[in-house]
């Protein structure tokens, strides 16, 4: 599966304690238990030699974590499940936010900030710390060490580091993208060969500009004034959605495809995803009749969600492509597939985009219950209840 960077605008920084609403941004809540699978398009490709890993934050029984994650009396844990069996638990400390812990390469990594420093740990043991309070937007484990891309919590600027050592530092600007993207193990980072890519927004004499960075150098730049709406780096190629005077285009390595905006419609937001050897744009358009969603590839394929449905995430793995459908509060209702199939939800919400994964044609959803409803792991429409007081934060297949 390709890692990618999708530009949707600035991600809100994670806080050590989270009060109502539970997490920054729109919660992805759901309510209807007992959903069932209604399509027959699941691939039979086995996950040979691979295991399913879930991360979750667990609070003491009876504690109302959905109202306040700070005023807890008792231990809070980050749990790791392998194939539905709990295999590891570490104290959560200040890392309860889903952006502040991740499972990668057989290890559970956490980060948190003191009043002056940022600390990165593995299995609860400190790996390194560095001066400055940073929200980690990109995280990779490579042969040369742990790569982090941190947004300054106390102001503008960001830093690219390896094991805490600075490779690139900007005193202004912001990282775009982050750990909430489905299937993007590196968060705001994207790998291609020996290179690491990421996208940032920096001020310039021409106003703000989007920069595609390759390692510690600027690789490509787009001024905001030219209408750039979204940027993707995948497979070493740079793609973007761009507004022009009378059209909206998807540009891949300089080649433009006109996107299917209707007469009188404008683009509210857009998102880019790599799919097979193509690039897919999800567009939310606004017209006189209200909002409309559509998906279109650079190769010209177009997919139209059902009228009135809200699309929140795009899932792809090179074999299949689908999109999550949510209601007005962000409740997960179903996943629709590009071939016309449907997988119904079984109740629960996605705390993070990393709670949804498409791998080898199989759909995995780590769904957190609301108002006492059970937490559920759903694989290809079949769910398993997990009776703990807390929330899922990711699903990974390795």
Regions inferred by a protein language model and the residue ranges of each:
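Sec-dependent bacterial lipoprotein signal peptides
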Residues: 1-16
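Bacterial Sec-dependent N-terminal signal peptides
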Residues: 16-49
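Short beta-strand elements that form the blades of beta-propeller/WD-repeat-like
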Residues: 48-68, 102-113, 145-152, 194-203, ...
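Structural motif
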Residues: 61-79, 115-120, 154-161, 204-212, ...
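A short beta-strand motif characteristic of beta-propeller blades
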Residues: 86-91, 125-130, 166-179, 217-222, ...
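Repeated scaffold domains used in trafficking and secretory/extracellular systems
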Residues: 94-105, 133-143, 174-193, 225-235, ...
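Acidic, serine/threonine- and glycine-rich low-complexity intrinsically disordered segments
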Residues: 182-187, 192-296, 310-321, 325-328, ...
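Blade-level signature of beta-propeller repeat domains, shared across WD40, Kelch, NHL, RCC1
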Residues: 357-359, 365-398
């Amino acid at each position: 599966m390709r890692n990618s960077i999708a530009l949707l605008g600035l991600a809100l920084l994670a806080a050590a304690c989270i009060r109502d609403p539970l997490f920054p941004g729109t919660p992805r809540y759901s309510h209807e238990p007992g959903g069932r699978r209604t399509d027959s398009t699941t691939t039979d490709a086995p996950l040979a030699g691979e295991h399913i890993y879930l991360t979750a934050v667990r609070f003491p029984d009876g504690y109302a974590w959905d109202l306040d994650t700070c005023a807890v009396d008792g231990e809070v844990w980050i749990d790791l499940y392998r194939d539905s069996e709990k295999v590891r638990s570490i104290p959560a400390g200040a890392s309860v936010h889903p952006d502040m812990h991740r499972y990668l390469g057989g290890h559970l990594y956490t980060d948190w900030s003191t009043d002056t420093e940022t600390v990165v740990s593995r299995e609860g043991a400190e790996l390194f710390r560095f001066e400055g309070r940073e929200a980690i937007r990109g995280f990779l484990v490579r042969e040369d060490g742990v790569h982090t891309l941190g947004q300054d919590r106390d102001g503008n600027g960001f830093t690219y580091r390896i094991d805490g050592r600075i490779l690139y530092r900007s005193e202004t600007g912001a990282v775009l993208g982050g750990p909430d993207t489905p299937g993007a193990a590196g968060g705001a980072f994207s790998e291609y060969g020996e290179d690491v890519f990421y996208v940032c927004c920096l001020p310039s004499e021409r106003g703000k500009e989007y920069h595609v960075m390759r390692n510690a150098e600027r690789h490509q730049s787009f001024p905001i004034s030219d209408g750039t709406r979204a940027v993707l780096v995948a497979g070493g190629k740079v793609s973007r959605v761009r507004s022009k005077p009378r059209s909206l285009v998807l540009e891949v390595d300089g080649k433009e495809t006109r996107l299917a905006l209707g007469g009188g419609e404008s683009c509210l937001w857009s998102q880019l995803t790599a799919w097979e050897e193509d690039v897919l744009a999800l567009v939310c358009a606004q017209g006189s009749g209200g909002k409309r969603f559509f998906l279109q590839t650079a190769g010209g394929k177009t997919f139209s969600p059902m009228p009135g449905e809200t699309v929140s995430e795009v899932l792809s793995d090179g074999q299949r492509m689908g999109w999550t459908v949510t209601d007005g509060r962000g409740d997960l209702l179903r996943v629709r597939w590009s071939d016309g199939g449907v997988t119904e939800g079984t109740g629960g919400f996605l705390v993070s985009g990393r709670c949804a994964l498409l791998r080898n044609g199989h759909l995995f959803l780590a769904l957190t219950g609301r108002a006492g409803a059970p937490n559920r792991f759903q694989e290809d429409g079949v769910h398993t209840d997990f009776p703990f007081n807390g929330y899922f934060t990711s699903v990974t297949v390795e």
